[in-house]
């Protein structure tokens, strides 16, 4: 990296968590990512660089940090860094190189952002998309996706976005009438992004 113009800089740290649902500062669903959490310093100039394991294999692409904000004395890296998992970054870069565009997975669900229970409540289903074809309906509360516990709508969005279009997902949901049901289906593709 080259933070503050200091070329050849390397930082070290440990991976604290995998599959950490984080947002990059906006409440727009596009800003949610499935991240690797690390305490390796990420500063302007070395974000976008690789996160490597002890054998030099790339495991992620450094992309964001948590900060205390300008109202606190500490700014910059505080030991909470986030990297995009390499398999996700590689899929997108391969698409961009091949087609000039990238795709993202689409399930065809909107979630209720006022729901405060554990899980993500389905507020809307897009006609003709994967969720409707699988039999999902409004009012379901998504509890797990591929075995990962869903705590809220952010966790649900991040779990879906960790996949590629066409991947098969398994969603377990609580029915409005009680009980649970499992839905297994392939994800659709959202329109390509330039």
Where are these regions (language model features)?
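Active-site loop architecture of trypsin-fold serine endopeptidases
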Residues: 1-14, 19-93
């Amino acid at each position: 990296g080259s933070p503050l113009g200091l070329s050849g800089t390397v930082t070290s740290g440990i991976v604290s968590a995998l599959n950490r649902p984080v947002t990059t500062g906006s409440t727009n669903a596009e800003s949610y990512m499935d991240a690797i959490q690390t305490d390796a310093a990420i500063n302007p100039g070395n974000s976008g660089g690789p996160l490597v394991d002890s054998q030099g294999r790339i495991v992620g692409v450094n992309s964001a940090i948590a900060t205390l904000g300008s109202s606190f004395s500490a700014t910059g890296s505080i030991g909470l860094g986030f990297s995009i998992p390499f398999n996700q970054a590689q899929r997108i870069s391969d698409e961009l190189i091949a087609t000039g565009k990238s795709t993202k997975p689409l399930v065809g669900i909107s979630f209720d952002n006022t729901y405060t229970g554990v899980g993500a409540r389905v507020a809307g289903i897009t006609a003709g998309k994967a969720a409707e074809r699988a039999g999902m309906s409004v009012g379901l509360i998504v509890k797990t996706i591929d075995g990962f516990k869903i705590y809220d709508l952010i966790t649900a969005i991040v779990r879906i976005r960790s996949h590629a279009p066409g991947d098969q997902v398994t969603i377990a949901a609580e029915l409005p009438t009680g009980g649970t049901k499992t839905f297994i289906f392939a994800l659709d593709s959202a329109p390509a992004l330039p």
